[in-house]
């Protein structure tokens, strides 16, 4: 004989089977219970700051606008360019580091960077990169 649904479901306000009672317990005071400790101060909620993603995007965009002012770039193409710049940077930095340790020095100088660029980039591209780099270093030292 089936039971009626009213008898099987718990009554409103009664605790469920296996869960603690909702009545005032020593841990949790009732409505008028005052908490011990500092007089009613609220705990400040600390928001987690979003981690900043570093990229060469703004610089790639500036160069694009210098070369082709009327051309845009998609986010996928920007991602590819960013990966390319990171790759070239890592290659040059790694080679410059090896050159520095081979010369038994502890500081990477512009000379090691220049040699690394000459070793990594082919022919005419290396010459242009070295001349542009020298120009940039000269501009930086004169502005200081």
From Swiss-Prot:
Its annotated compartments are: Nucleus; Chromosome
Q: Keywords on this record?
A: Chromosome, DNA-binding, Glycoprotein, Isopeptide bond, Nucleosome core, Nucleus, Phosphoprotein, Ubl conjugation
Give the record's GO CC terms.
Answer: nucleosome; nucleus
Motif SPKK motif 4: positions: 19-22
Molecular function in Gene Ontology = DNA binding; protein heterodimerization activity; structural constituent of chromatin
Short motif (SPKK motif 2): ranges? 9-12
Region ranges (Disordered):
1-51
Q: Which domain of life is it from?
A: Eukaryota
InterPro entries in the record: Histone-fold (IPR009072), Histone_H2A/H2B/H3 (IPR007125), Histone_H2B (IPR000558), HISTONE_H2B_site (IPR055333)
Q: Which SMART domains match?
A: H2B
Residues modified by carbohydrate are: 131
Q: Which residues carry this modification: Phosphoserine?
A: 14, 19, 25
Enter cross-link residues for Glycyl lysine isopeptide (Lys-Gly) (interchain with G-Cter in ubiquitin): 139
Which parts of the sequence form the motif SPKK motif 3? 14-17
Which intervals carry biased composition (Basic residues)? Answer: 24-51
The role this protein plays is: Core component of nucleosome. Nucleosomes wrap and compact DNA into chromatin, limiting DNA accessibility to the cellular machineries which require DNA as a template. Histones thereby play a central role in transcription regulation, DNA repair, DNA replication and chromosomal stability. DNA accessibility is regulated via a complex set of post-translational modifications of histones, also called histone code, and nucleosome remodeling.
Subunit organization: The nucleosome is a histone octamer containing two molecules each of H2A, H2B, H3 and H4 assembled in one H3-H4 heterotetramer and two H2A-H2B heterodimers. The octamer wraps approximately 147 bp of DNA.
The protein's name is Histone H2B.2, sperm
* Species of provenance: Parechinus angulosus (Angulate sea urchin)
Its ancestry begins with:
Eukaryota, Metazoa, Echinodermata, Eleutherozoa, Echinozoa
């Amino acid at each position: 004989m089936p039971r009626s649904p009213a008898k099987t479901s718990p009554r409103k306000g009664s605790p469920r089977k296996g869960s603690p009672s909702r009545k005032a317990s020593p841990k949790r005071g009732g409505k008028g219970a005052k908490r011990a400790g500092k007089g009613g101060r609220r705990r400040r909620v600390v928001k987690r700051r979003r981690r900043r993603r570093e990229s060469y995007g703004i610089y790639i965009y500036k160069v694009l606008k210098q070369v082709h002012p009327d051309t845009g770039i998609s986010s996928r193409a920007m991602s590819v360019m960013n990966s390319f710049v990171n790759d070239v940077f890592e290659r040059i930095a790694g080679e410059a580091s090896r050159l520095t340790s081979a010369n038994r020095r502890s500081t990477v100088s512009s000379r090691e960077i220049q040699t690394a660029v000459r070793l990594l980039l082919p022919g005419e591209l290396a010459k242009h990169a070295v001349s542009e780099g020298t120009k940039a270093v000269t501009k930086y030292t004169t502005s200081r």
